[in-house]
């Protein structure tokens, strides 16, 4: 009995998808990346933050975040320059990004993590889970402040 060509393709795709490893880094790998970041001893910096997914009011909006002494001190929308009304506590420092990545890696919801090749801070974190807990965080335009 011959299988139709479309069925061969479907069987091949199932085989490929079944072999696809979508597991992100382990909690111990995230811990190693954090240690590399900490070696730089950067406590004052700014970056642009973009979250997509997560079903919150900040999703899809680029935000300029300023961190001084390892604490978020200011946050403004890049497009308008307006202050973010949600409060500074909802925006992460790099250390808090690592905290979230490590927790997600431990419970299996960290899908991917991309790092800056020089300073080893996360540039992108992808999370999988229920719709309100799935999405991507992107860090760009990072600069060390004096």
Where are these regions (language model features)?
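Extracytosolic low-complexity repeat regions of secreted or lipid-anchored proteins
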Residues: 106-127
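Sec-dependent bacterial lipoprotein signal peptides
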Residues: 1-17
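Short, exposed beta-strand-loop hairpins at the edges of beta-sheets
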Residues: 122-138
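Short, flexible N-terminal segments of the mature chain
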Residues: 61-75
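Short, surface-exposed coil-to-beta transition loops
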Residues: 57-63, 134-139
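A short, Trp-centered hydrophobic/proline-enriched beta-strand micro-motif
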Residues: 40-51
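Bacterial Sec-dependent N-terminal signal peptides
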Residues: 14-34
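A short-motif feature that recognizes glycine-rich, charge-decorated loops
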Residues: 71-109
């Amino acid at each position: 009995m011959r299988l139709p060509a479309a069925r061969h393709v479907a069987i091949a795709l199932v085989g490929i998808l079944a072999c696809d490893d979508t597991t992100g880094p382990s909690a111990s790998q995230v811990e190693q990346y954090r240690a590399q970041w900490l070696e730089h001893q950067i406590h004052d910096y700014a970056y642009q933050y973009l979250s997509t997914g997560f079903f919150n009011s900040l999703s899809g909006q680029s935000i300029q975040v300023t961190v001084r002494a390892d604490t978020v001190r200011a946050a403004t929308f890049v497009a308008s320059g307006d202050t973010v009304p949600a409060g500074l506590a909802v925006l992460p420092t790099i250390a808090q990004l690592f905290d979230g990545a490590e927790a997600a890696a431990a419970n299996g919801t960290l899908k991917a993590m991309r790092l800056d090749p020089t300073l080893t801070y996360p540039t992108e974190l992808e999370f999988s889970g229920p719709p309100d807990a799935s999405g991507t965080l992107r860090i760009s335009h990072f600069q060390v402040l004096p």
